[in-house]
Amino acid sequence: MVKFMYNKVLRFKHWYESRFSKILPLWAFLPLVGCFVLNAFVYWITQLLMAGAYHYDFTLPIDRKVPVIPGWISIYILSYAFWAINYIVIARQNRRTCYRLVFADYFSKIVCGVIFIIIPTTNVRPEVIGSSVWEFLLKFIYLMDSPTNLFPSIHCLVSWLCAIGLRGTRVSTWYKVFSYAFAIAVCISTQLTKQHYIVDVFGGIALAEISLLIGEHFVKRKNFT
């Protein structure tokens, strides 16, 4: 049985390296898969655990003045592709950059999980009136994504990691600028779609910065190159 599994692993290794190693090295593949798995686990498990708990609403007066603009749901949805692309771009640079990002991602998601349990949050979504494609997509997101686990915003957290994870890399300056611009656009989209409120945004950005800083110390101690 052990030999059988070993042969399967070797076959996968050869198959992956012959097809995808130029896009993403094998040593970066599993850690990035781990980011996806941990994100899903933290988000959905905490929702189940806290389903019957009291949820806090951190709505501020400024939040009530922000209008709903359904078209911004396009940025909100495109953020998923942005995450995948930038995580690959960052991870393929070298082991140090890869593991700095991965450690920051893992650490921040664990912190999110703890906060989601200690301080479960929610908000009151507006009624979406209209039948345009943007309103349809906004209604769909509202249907699929319950208004819980809001603080800190994982959307803002991961988008900001996608931008700051490029620090110190040889990635072209224009792409770094684009990544910051898109990350900011994602943060704005969370406000204009009422998926999050302002404290969620700043919480996500702050956690991203702290997590990457800790990730930098981690890779220095482990002496990754």
Range-by-range predicted roles:
Residues 40-41, 109-115, 181-192:
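Aromatic-anchored segments of alpha-helical transmembrane domains
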Residues 82-86, 157-164, 181-189:
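Hydrophobic, membrane-inserted alpha-helices
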Residues 37, 75-82, 154-158, 202-206:
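Membrane-embedded alpha-helical segments of multi-pass membrane proteins
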Residues 2-83, 138:
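N-terminal transmembrane-helix/juxtamembrane module of multi-pass inner/ER membrane proteins
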Residues 163-167, 208-216:
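Hydrophobic transmembrane alpha-helices
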Residues 46-61, 91-174, 222-224:
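Membrane-interface loops
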Residues 147-151, 185-212:
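Interfacial helix-loop-helix junctions of multi-pass membrane proteins
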